[in-house]
Amino acid sequence: MPPANPYSKYIKQYQTNNINTATPEKLMIMLFDGAIQFLQKAKIAIAEKNVQERSLNIDGARKIIRELMRTIDLENGNDVSKGLFRLYNRMSMNLIKANVQRNSDKVDEVIEDLTNIRWGFQKAIEIQSGVTTLEEAMKEQQAGEENEHQFPPIVENGGNNAE
């Protein structure tokens, strides 16, 4: 068993402070990043045939997706809200299949969906705060469709990917 990280207490405190001081918008981005990181680790576990790590990481991502589902106001929402809820539900079902079938392709599908939704939320935040314009975001989206998505890196020992 590897020795405990002597900084783990401080890392945990840093993460807690980040969560406690984050805006609701930043918390949403953090949820997407967390789910994507869980799924990247699940893919590694699938490749290594590590049942425990696969299940643990897929379950972590599913918990985050359920939390994202809870943020949707279906009673007062529009078709976009309902569509997003169905998409999250499909992702959750795909992760169940991925876990049972040890299928990394299903995990990749969910990573791609989460990455696309995260990008949309990030751009909406940037537009709302005046960091970018809708036109700039649309140009970036068109350029991004020509390239592969860049996923947040996996960080060991509970690290934080603060932007």
Protein language model features and the residues they cover:
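Generic structural concept
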Residues: I29-I36, S55-R62, F85-S92, D108-R118
